[in-house]
């Protein structure tokens, strides 16, 4: 079996590459996915409101666990990653958030990353997107990713929470992906006009599946990348339950798109990574790159939960006897509660003046429940998810053996710096001030969590240690750049090797201010043009907000 390109991982990035590369009819592509198909009749992945379900099983979730996190009471924390066509876009929360313009301008300050500025990236965000209310300078109108905007008549709690943020002195913004990210406003979601999850399997692969030059193999677990000297020449993978590997050869390039946990793991297993680690595991060294698996970053978040005095929350939707009607309305009409991820409002603020752009993100949810669907409060309630955006803490991913079925050792090293603790204390206190605003007076009942007795720095820190959870945004473990810890250059090419790129969230040099999926897709769109040797899309000329001397909060 020989192909021009072999793509490892049919996730948010891999499906973009598979679709774009096979637009050239003379180019053959093999797309390998360790998980199974994205079954379109499975409401768990297709119904936006069911987003908690795929995280609970193993069919669509790798369900990794971290090593005991030293600053988090030594908890082993969950690290869910998507498995199946679509990757994490098949199980994520569907929030369409791109990050702040300053994130990309900051990336572009690093040598070799000059063309990753916001105005260089914006055309690729637009290329990927079809926004339901039409294109403008910031949004696309004919891309593969369906983006749905919140509509009039949605839950009144969304509007009350945004108003409360504005009353507390923070900006209002009409579009968190537009001119100004900073502030509170409506949040877009990756959902189709028919109310289905817009994974990259649906948006991208559906265009490409029928092409004769694309072969998709599911249940194909990559064992390792094969090299001839310093050149990647193919991939060995295990098909289904098979004990023997299947080999495929790549004439041009191997494209590793397995995500921030699996991509460094596959590189290390293939002999690319820190020499001491590979020697310890008796893995033959192909090329020493000390940064493979290092620089791991994530977002941590907490829930602040309140009882709701007015019976307008989604609590009734959690009761089994109401669910058949919700399911039927979604199935047949593509509308109703089932068609939304219920994260229809949120925002970004600066907790202190020293931050040049927002460092805290909010998601508002009109029900009191854990992200994975557990511990639902048995009454009407609402909550704010809040967390810091650019933690200075750094973790790592390390392969434990040559066995591709063994999960790696993962340590995020959450909350390792004083800045982390300061940001979370600030975030809880600011959230309480927002929740105390008049806009929420008719809704706000008692504080359920953390609870009104949790007030001192020590009490807040203890709450964070015990209750903060991942936002499922692992990234940066094979970072782009030119320094000694960089793994790839600005086009995703692995340093010191030929015919091998990494294209996924692992190559972000620094984590972005917001959810990762939209940016992961943009990265793949941008590098796809590089692989095809096409002229990059012309830079955008859109103007965008920079806070400058503007106060973080009006008094």
UniProtKB/Swiss-Prot annotation:
Pfam families: GMC_oxred_C, GMC_oxred_N
One MF term in the entry's GO annotations: flavin adenine dinucleotide binding
UniProt pathway: Amine and polyamine biosynthesis; betaine biosynthesis via choline pathway; betaine aldehyde from choline (cytochrome c reductase route): step 1/1
Disulfides per UniProt: none
Binding site for FAD: 4-33
Biological processes annotated in GO: glycine betaine biosynthetic process from choline
Catalytic activity entry: choline + A = betaine aldehyde + AH2; betaine aldehyde + NAD(+) + H2O = glycine betaine + NADH + 2 H(+)
Flavoprotein keyword on record: yes
Requisite cofactors: FAD
Enzyme Commission number(s) from the entry: 1.1.99.1, 1.2.1.8
GO cellular component: membrane
Keyword hit for Flavoprotein: yes
Function (record text): Involved in the biosynthesis of the osmoprotectant glycine betaine. Catalyzes the oxidation of choline to betaine aldehyde and betaine aldehyde to glycine betaine at the same rate.
PANTHER family: CHOLINE DEHYDROGENASE, MITOCHONDRIAL, GLUCOSE-METHANOL-CHOLINE GMC OXIDOREDUCTASE
Similarity section: Belongs to the GMC oxidoreductase family.
HAMAP family the UniProt entry points to: Choline_dehydrogen
Name recorded for this polypeptide: Oxygen-dependent choline dehydrogenase
Annotated organism of origin: Serratia proteamaculans (strain 568)
